[in-house]
């Protein structure tokens, strides 16, 4: 029997198989060889290109057992019995996942750095090779971010093109062409697609749009509460709080169910306990009485508007898929892959099961419970348990389960020291850490715990360490034959955006080049600010302050330096200021563009400005001049302006795309552009800066600046050196106005902390709660501690060669510092 995808040969005659191996490799068949040292060396030398591409895997083995396994058909369990024990370099678990029966559902637990993306790509290649009728359009893959979807697309395409380059087999080109039809998307894009296919039974059509519905939700809450109470009686007595406060609390509490993905039908099955006192009874009664009605009427609003909201799109899809009337969609789904499954909420888990039930695909989910760090979005750290429970309830075949433990990312010396921490946290019940991973990276590395200094010395210490590590990395790269890539970076990771802002200020103050990646910062970026200033100058051309600001932007180009002392002598006289600034304005093309804006389409003129003016070059010149004035060293000026200019350029391209999508058309005025920018600059804190896509040459220079981001932003990434500068932040476990929901136990606890009058601090509105809050708060506190431990785990496992944690003395057990101290610290 000839192999379709792979052949495993153990202790076979190389003389007998050498020509066959040559033929298999040239057809794209993976060959896995186990033999003596001489045979292994011969194969790796003769088929070096295939070995480098991992199409040939050759391992030394001491046992004399013989075996041939074709396409993973290991009926006698040879891999488990012998190869896993006798050849640690062979990744038996990855082999078994890759070659698992194509009719099986699969769950893969993959710790950080164990190659989960690789195993997903290899699994798809196995399915393509062994199922001639399979098309990539029948393979669906769900990721949790657009970046992850893009990366998966790139990795699959690279794998197919590499095989084509090595073999010349046309099937790989055909699969590359088919790849554009493969459904790799984020969870929300997938839900939107499925709602358009299945939603007709609930009066949704394929014209379904996406809206926020924030206004409609607030109005609905107001109307339902208003309809519930007697307007002729005291409102506060019926609600326990004023109407406006009840409105806000109901909105927050209702959102709590949406966030966790609790379905509409399950909301009505929740146990709310009892009010703890007579003062809490009114709100308890209102809340339990209106929740189902809110959900019903909100769903009707969405139906009437033929629109859904991103916030509860998965709940809506679950509701649709569980309805009695389901259309038969024109979808063929043979395989459904879900990445980062530990970040799933209840509705996402149920939807994946319902898709299996309705369309009969084989399910493949991969994730790591130790990296479940999106609890604030509703992620369930018991996602794999819930999945198996839901599959059983729906009578879906039991999945095959695998665990990947071979770590290819982190230096063995670093990983072995990390394991001391992870093992203790596992014994403490803070981390699900069953057994240590096996390190395969033998590069030198180091983990350092540095005693944190106090108060104002803390920032200086952080800057010293950052500067030292940056210089050390630059020195290593410039004295190495290896070229730098996107992983060759010093990265500083923070827990919160507030810490990230503090870190950015510290590095800037100490003249250290740094790139800050934060969510929602696009409309606060230099790029948008400068563009907004330019647009404002055209609209308010008679006001000196707008012209002055314009002259400071890269759009003004190289002009004579303005003297602020000269301007002060004008004492704010309007005519003199206009005349003074006009001298500088004449050195630019501003007046030409101002005239063009009256004669030509606005967006066309703005595009001309970007094409004609050397905006990026001017930005670099301005930045260098300012840094030089501020005392920066020349090499750090070069590093900072290089990375900042790349980001500026990427943001500029993104801004023009946004303007074109939102304001495209000949009738757009400069005022429309100004109004759009003003609104978003003032309110939009969700749009993130553009992803900088660099070519190979550009990537080689990125290592000269530090990269700063939150741990959540860094998830899935890896870097040469990781610094964790802040470990003394207290975990948020205090009581507050909140709703706590146990979705598995179906319990609900709620609490209102009350309001005090500012002057005399007396209670204006007393605290309220229900009987389950204390119990659920204790559970929530422990859950918070476990999640914070997982976040620290994610931060630490981003490191490849070096990990530095700054650990100050901590008297509070609810900090990262205390977690580290639990294990013991050998301070540097």
Briefly describe each language-model feature range.
Residues 1-70, 218, 222, 254, ...:
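Structured N-terminal alpha/beta-domain signature
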Residues 2-4, 16, 30-45, 53-154, ...:
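Conserved motor-region signature of P-loop NTPase helicases/translocases
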Residues 28, 36-60, 138, 217-307, ...:
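Conserved ATP-driven helicase/translocase motor core recognized via long
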Residues 35-37, 55, 137-246, 382-386:
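Conserved P-loop NTPase-based nucleic-acid remodeling module centered on helicase motor cores
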Residues 93-95, 100-103, 184-191, 217-221, ...:
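Conserved helicase/translocase P-loop NTPase motor core
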Residues 97, 177-183, 199-287, 342, ...:
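ATP-hydrolysis module of ASCE/P-loop NTPase motor domains
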Residues 486, 535-794, 798:
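Conserved helicase C-terminal RecA-like lobe
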């Amino acid at each position: 029997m000839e192999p379709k995808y792979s052949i495993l040969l153990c202790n076979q005659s190389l003389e007998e198989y050498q020509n066959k191996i040559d033929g298999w490799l040239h057809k794209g068949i993976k060959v896995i060889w186990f033999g003596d040292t001489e045979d292994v060396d011969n194969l790796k030398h003769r088929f070096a290109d295939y070995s480098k591409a991992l199409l040939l895997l050759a391992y030394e083995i001491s046992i004399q057992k013989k075996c041939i396994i074709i396409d993973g058909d290991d009926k006698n369990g040879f891999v488990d019995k012998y190869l896993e024990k006798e050849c640690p370099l062979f990744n038996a678990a990855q082999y078994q996942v890759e070659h698992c029966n194509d009719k099986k559902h699969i769950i893969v637990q993959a710790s950080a750095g164990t190659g989960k993306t690789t195993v997903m790509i290899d699994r798809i290649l196995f399915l393509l090779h062994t199922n001639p009728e399979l098309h990539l359009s029948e393979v669906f893959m769900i990721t949790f971010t657009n970046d992850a979807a893009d990366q998966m697309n790139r990795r699959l395409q690279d794998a197919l093109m590499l095989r084509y380059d090595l073999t010349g087999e046309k099937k790989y080109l055909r699969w590359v062409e088919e790849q554009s039809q493969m459904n790799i998307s984020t969870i929300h894009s997938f839900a939107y697609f499925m709602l358009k296919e299945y939603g007709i039974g609930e009066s949704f059509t394929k014209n379904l749009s996406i809206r926020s519905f924030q206004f409609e939700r607030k109005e609905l809450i107001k109307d339902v509460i208003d309809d519930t109470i007697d307007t002729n009686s005291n409102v506060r007595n019926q609600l326990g709080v004023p109407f406006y406060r009840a409105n806000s609390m109901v909105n927050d509490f209702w959102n709590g169910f949406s966030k966790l993905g609790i379905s509409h039908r399950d909301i009505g099955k929740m146990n709310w306990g009892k009010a703890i006192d007579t003062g809490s009874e009114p709100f308890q009664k209102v809340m339990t009485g209106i929740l189902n009605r809110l959900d019903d009427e909100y769903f009707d609003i969405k139906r009437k508007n033929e629109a859904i909201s991103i916030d509860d799109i998965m709940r809506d899809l679950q509701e649709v898929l569980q309805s009695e009337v389901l259309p038969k969609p024109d979808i063929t789904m043979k395989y459904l892959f879900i990445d980062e499954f530990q970040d799933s909420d209840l509705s996402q888990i149920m939807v994946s099961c319902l898709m299996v039930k309705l369309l009969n695909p084989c399910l493949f989910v991969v994730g790591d419970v130790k990296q479940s760090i999106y609890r604030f979005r509703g992620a369930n750290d018991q996602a794999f348990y819930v999945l198996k429970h839901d599959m059983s309830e729906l009578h879906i075949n039991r999945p095959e389960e695998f665990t990947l433990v071979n770590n290819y990312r982190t230096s063995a010396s670093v990983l072995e020291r990390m394991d001391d921490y992870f093992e203790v946290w596992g014994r403490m019940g803070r981390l699900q850490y069953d057994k240590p991973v096996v390190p395969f990276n033998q590069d030198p590395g180091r983990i350092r715990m540095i005693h944190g200094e106090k108060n104002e010395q803390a920032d200086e210490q952080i800057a010293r360490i950052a500067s030292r590590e940056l210089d050390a990395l630059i020195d290593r790269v410039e004295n190495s034959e290896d070229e730098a890539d996107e992983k060759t970076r010093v990265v500083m990771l923070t827990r919160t955006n507030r810490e990230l802002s503090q870190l950015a200020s510290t590095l800037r103050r100490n003249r250290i080049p740094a790139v800050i990646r934060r969510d929602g910062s696009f409309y606060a970026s230099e790029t948008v600010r400068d563009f907004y200033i330019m647009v404002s100058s055209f609209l308010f051309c008679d006001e000196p302050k707008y012209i002055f600001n314009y002259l400071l932007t890269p759009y003004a180009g190289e002009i004579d330096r303005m003297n602020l002392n000269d301007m002060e002598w004008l004492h704010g006289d309007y005519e003199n200021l206009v005349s003074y600034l006009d001298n500088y304005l004449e050195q630019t093309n501003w007046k030409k563009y101002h005239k063009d804006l009256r004669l030509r389409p606005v967006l066309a003129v703005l595009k001309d400005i970007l094409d004609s003016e050397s905006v990026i070059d001017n930005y670099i010149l301005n930045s260098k001049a300012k840094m030089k004035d501020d005392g920066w060293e020349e090499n750090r000026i070069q590093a900072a302006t290089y990375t900042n200019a790349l980001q500026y350029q990427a943001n500029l391209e993104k801004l023009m795309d946004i303007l074109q999508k939102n304001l495209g058309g000949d009738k757009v005025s400069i005022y429309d552009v100004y109004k759009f920018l003003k609104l978003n600059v003032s309110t939009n804190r969700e749009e993130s800066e553009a992803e900088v896509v660099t070519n190979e040459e550009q990537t080689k220079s990125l290592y000269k600046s530090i990269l700063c981001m939150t741990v959540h932003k860094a998830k899935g990434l890896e870097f040469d050196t990781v610094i964790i500068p802040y470990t003394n932040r207290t975990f948020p476990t205090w009581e507050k106005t909140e709703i706590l929901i146990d979705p598995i136990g179906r319990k609900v606890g709620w609490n209102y902390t009350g309001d005090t009058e500012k002057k005399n601090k007396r209670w204006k509105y007393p605290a309220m709660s229900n009987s389950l809050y204390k119990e659920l708060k204790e559970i929530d506190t422990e859950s918070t501690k476990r999640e914070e431990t997982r976040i620290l785990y994610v931060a630490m496992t981003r490191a490849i060669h070096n990990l530095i944690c700054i650990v100050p003395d901590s008297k509070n057990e609810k900090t990262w510092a205390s977690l580290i101290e639990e294990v013991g610290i050998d301070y540097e």
